[in-house]
A protein has these predicted regions:
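Membrane-interfacial, low-structure loops and terminal tails that flank and connect transmembrane helices
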Residues: 1-10, 285-289, 348
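Membrane-proximal helix-loop-helix interfaces that form the catalytic/acceptor-binding platform
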Residues: 13-344, 354-355
C-alpha cells in the first residue's frame, strides 16, 4: 500500500509539474533580444501597417494569420524595441500544447500516457528551439495537435461542440504554414478512411461539413498558395544545389533530436534507435488496445515526411526539420503509448519472475 501511495503521488506530481517545468524552461528562451534571419523577418512584419502586411504576405509563402496574431500580441505587450513579447507568444502557444497533453490526452487515454506525452515533449530539443522561435511553428503545433485530439474525441462520442472545435482548430492550422496545411489535408484523408473502414456513418455528415467549411474559409489564400508554388516550379533554375541530399535528411534528424554541437552521426543513430524501440512498443499498444488513433497520428507525420521528400527531390530543398514540426505532437503521442506499453510489458515480466 505504501508503494502504491508513493507511486500515485509521483505520477500526480509529474502530471501537475511538467507544464510548470515547461513554462520555466521555455520561458527562459524568450528573455533575449537576439534574432536569427527568419525571426528578424517576423519582427519586420510586425512593424508594418496592416494593409502593407497583408500585401507582402500575398507574395510570401505564408498567410497573414500568424503575423496578425503576433502584431496584436506585440502591441498588447507594449511594443517597443524589445523582442521578448514576440518570443513570448510562441512560449504561450507551447504551454497551450502542454496543457492539451495534460488534460485532453489524459481524458482520451490516461494520466500515465499524458505524463509520457508531456515528458517526451519537454525532453525533445526541437521543442525548446521552437518555444523561443519568432515563427509560426509553435502556433501550428498547438492547432494541429488540437485538431488530432478533437478528431479522436469525435470518433469516440460525437457532439456539435466537438465538431466546432475540430473545425476551428483545422482552420487555425491550415492558415499557419504551408506544411501545416499539407499535414491537415493528410490527416483529413486518414480520418475519412477510418470513418469508412469502421462504418461510422453518423460521422460522415459532420466530416464533410467541417471539411467544406475549412476549404471555404481557406479558399481565398489557397489561390495565393497555388500561385506561389507554380511560380517556384516555373522559375526554378534546375540547379541540384538546392535539392535535398542524404546529408539533408541527417540534418533533419539532428534538428529534431539534438543540440547544434552534437556529432550528427551519433544523433541519427540514437534518434532512429529511439524511434524504432518506441514504435515497436506503440504497435504492440495499438494491437492490444484495438485503438489505431496513435497510428493514424504517426502516419500523418510519416506521410508529411514523404511529401516533403518528394518536393525536396524534385523542386527544391524543404527545411523539414522545422516544417514538419507542427506534427510533432502526433509523434509524441506515438512515443507515449509506445513507452507506456514497454513499461507495462516490463512490469508483467517482473511479476512472472518473482511469482
Amino acid at each position: 500500500k505504501q508503494h502504491n501511495f508513493t507511486e500515485n503521488n509521483m505520477w500526480a506530481l509529474l502530471w501537475h509539474g511538467l507544464p510548470v517545468a515547461a513554462l520555466l524552461l521555455w520561458g527562459a528562451f524568450c528573455i533575449t533580444n537576439s534574432l536569427w534571419y527568419d525571426e528578424a523577418y517576423s519582427a519586420s512584419m510586425v512593424s508594418l501597417p496592416w494593409k502593407r502586411l497583408i500585401y507582402i504576405t500575398a507574395t510570401d509563402d505564408h498567410s497573414p494569420f500568424y503575423y496578425v496574431l503576433l502584431k496584436i500580441f506585440y502591441h498588447l505587450c507594449g511594443g517597443g524595441t524589445h523582442f521578448w513579447a514576440l518570443k513570448l507568444m510562441s512560449v504561450l502557444f507551447m504551454l497551450g500544447y502542454m496543457l492539451l497533453g495534460k488534460y485532453y490526452v489524459a481524458k482520451l487515454f490516461d494520466r500515465k500516457i499524458s505524463v509520457y506525452f508531456m515528458l517526451f515533449s519537454l525532453l525533445m530539443p526541437i521543442f525548446s528551439v521552437q518555444a523561443g522561435n519568432v515563427r509560426m511553428y509553435a502556433v501550428a503545433l498547438f492547432f494541429l495537435t488540437l485538431t488530432g485530439l478533437s478528431a479522436y474525441d469525435i470518433f469516440r462520442e460525437p457532439t456539435r461542440k466537438k465538431w466546432i472545435v475540430f473545425c476551428i482548430a483545422s482552420i487555425g492550422t491550415v492558415y499557419c504554414h504551408t506544411f501545416a496545411l499539407i499535414q491537415t489535408f493528410l490527416f483529413y484523408l486518414l480520418f475519412f478512411a477510418v470513418i469508412l473502414i469502421c462504418h461510422k456513418k453518423e460521422l460522415i455528415k459532420g466530416y464533410f461539413i467541417s471539411g467544406f467549411t475549412v476549404a471555404l474559409v481557406f479558399s481565398p489564400w489557397l489561390a495565393v498558395t497555388i500561385r506561389q508554388f507554380v511560380l517556384r516550379m516555373r522559375y526554378d533554375d534546375g540547379s541540384t544545389a538546392e535539392l535535398a541530399t542524404l546529408y539533408s535528411v541527417m540534418d533533419y534528424c539532428k534538428e529534431w533530436f539534438s543540440a547544434v554541437e552534437t556529432p550528427i552521426g551519433i544523433v541519427v543513430l540514437l534518434g532512429m534507435a529511439l524511434c524504432l524501440v518506441l514504435s515497436y512498443g506503440a504497435v504492440d499498444w495499438v494491437r492490444q488496445n484495438h485503438n489505431i488513433a496513435p497510428a493514424i497520428a504517426f502516419g500523418t507525420f510519416a506521410l508529411t515526411g514523404i511529401v516533403g521528400g518528394v518536393i525536396s527531390a524534385t523542386v527544391n530543398n524543404c527545411f523539414m526539420g522545422r516544417y514538419a514540426f507542427p506534427g510533432m505532437g502526433f509523434v509524441m503521442l506515438w512515443y507515449a503509448v509506445g513507452f507506456a506499453q514497454i513499461t507495462e510489458n516490463t512490469k508483467g515480466k517482473s511479476r512472472k519472475i518473482w511469482a
